[in-house]
Amino acid sequence: MAILKLEDGTIYTQLHDISRELSSLNIQLNHWPVGDNLETHNLLEKDVLSDDQKEEFLQSVDHYFEELKETAGYQSRDLLAIHPEIPNLDAILSKFDKCHTHADDEARYIVAGICIFGFVRPDDSQVELTLQPQEYINIPANTEHWFYLTPEKRVKAVRYFSSTEGWTPHYTSTEIHFKKS
């Protein structure tokens, strides 16, 4: 269940409330079940997956990818598996914990773990959205945002791409009003 936190401390957990608060950004948020396949769930329990295991998992949820290809023109996908044992993880994550934008939409399907996206709304107020397993988010191109993990530093996410050129972060000078949880 997604959790949206406003700067004044207000917290929303109902999808209709979260959607209302994010409507000015045109962010899409959906609940996408992973399914009941035991092997799929076993793969999600592992920190490190081989390329073959990643592909096996991706194929188990490809019905979502097929829908995105048809409706939004996505061309490829991969499975990102972040865990604390990744060398230089903090340096890698530091590329995304500052306000930035991307030239393309950022589409993520969180399948394990927890992550936080923060957003700057058109009125310059800020919100933070905690995403949990089985939640899909699409952040439109040029939306000012940041990203970080919980202290556990574990997340698995399917990333959907319409191209790879638009994934370079373009940093802004906006100061983040929230403190990392």
From Swiss-Prot:
GO terms for biological process: L-methionine salvage from methylthioadenosine; L-methionine salvage from S-adenosylmethionine. The record marks R108 as: Important to generate the dianion. Keywords: Amino-acid biosynthesis, Dioxygenase, Iron, Metal-binding, Methionine biosynthesis, Nickel, Oxidoreductase. It holds the Pfam family ARD. Fe(2+) binds at H100, H102, E106, H145. Ni(2+) binds at H100, H102, E106, H145. Its cofactor is Fe(2+); Ni(2+). GO terms for molecular function: acireductone dioxygenase (Ni2+-requiring) activity; acireductone dioxygenase [iron(II)-requiring] activity; iron ion binding; nickel cation binding. The record marks D105 as: May play a role in transmitting local conformational changes. Pathway: Amino-acid biosynthesis; L-methionine biosynthesis via salvage pathway; L-methionine from S-methyl-5-thio-alpha-D-ribose 1-phosphate: step 5/6. InterPro entries: ARD, ARD_bac, RmlC-like_jellyroll, RmlC_Cupin_sf. It catalyses: 1,2-dihydroxy-5-(methylsulfanyl)pent-1-en-3-one + O2 = 3-(methylsulfanyl)propanoate + CO + formate + 2 H(+); 1,2-dihydroxy-5-(methylsulfanyl)pent-1-en-3-one + O2 = 4-methylsulfanyl-2-oxobutanoate + formate + 2 H(+). Its EC number is 1.13.11.54, 1.13.11.53. Binds 1 Fe(2+) cation per monomer. Binds 1 nickel ion per monomer. Catalyzes 2 different reactions between oxygen and the acireductone 1,2-dihydroxy-3-keto-5-methylthiopentene (DHK-MTPene) depending upon the metal bound in the active site. Fe-containing acireductone dioxygenase (Fe-ARD) produces formate and 2-keto-4-methylthiobutyrate (KMTB), the alpha-ketoacid precursor of methionine in the methionine recycle pathway. Ni-containing acireductone dioxygenase (Ni-ARD) produces methylthiopropionate, carbon monoxide and formate, and does not lie on the methionine recycle pathway. HAMAP family: Salvage_MtnD. Monomer. Belongs to the acireductone dioxygenase (ARD) family. This is Acireductone dioxygenase. It comes from Trichodesmium erythraeum (strain IMS101). The lineage of its organism: Bacteria, Bacillati, Cyanobacteriota, Cyanophyceae, Oscillatoriophycideae.
